Regions:
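N-terminal beta-strand motif that seeds the catalytic metal site of vicinal oxygen chelate
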Residues: 1-18, 64-67, 117-134
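Core segments of cupin and vicinal oxygen chelate
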Residues: 2, 8-50
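Vicinal oxygen chelate
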Residues: 3-12, 41-44, 57-134, ...
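Conserved beta-strand in the GNAT
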Residues: 51-53, 112
Length: 134
């Protein structure tokens, strides 16, 4: 059964929010990525991951951007989407290492579809990533 494994929030100061969630809720930092001078921080509670994404669209609201499902077989999900007359899912850019695809629900809410996810070796190609053992 597909499982929600991450939420992504748009925020003004991802590093400050990361510190807040780590100190108050004991979340752990998984990684961070800086692109075009903006830093995104990725946290986990060991079960759900929280992506704190830097606001880059001036005047746009902060808040929930998308959520992500971990699935065993993305082709099965694609077939189910067709039954709902939903085109997609679309492949994510290769530099987006935590999810292979993105789609929307009937109201346009975005979600990621990943056969891998945050619990994998980032050096291994997508769809072949083995879980990281601690």
């Amino acid at each position: 059964m597909p499982k929600i494994r991450h939420l992504a929030m748009i925020c003004m100061d991802p590093e400050k929010l990361a510190k807040f969630y780590c100190e108050v809720f004991e979340m752990k930092e998984v990684t961070r990525a800086t692109r075009n001078g903006r830093t995104n921080v990725f946290l986990t509670d060991g079960y759900i991951n929280l992506a704190l994404l830097s606001q880059k669209a001036e005047g746009k609201a902060n808040g929930l951007n998308h959520f992500g499902f971990h699935v065993e077989d993305s082709d099965v999900i694609a077939e189910r989407l067709k039954q709902w007359d939903i085109v997609g899912p679309s492949d994510r850019p290769p530099d987006r290492v935590y999810a292979e695809q993105r789609a929307t629900d009937p109201e346009g809410n975005m979600y990621d579809i990943a056969e891998g996810g945050f619990d994998r070796d980032l050096a291994t190609p997508k769809k072949t990533k083995a879980p990281v053992t601690a």
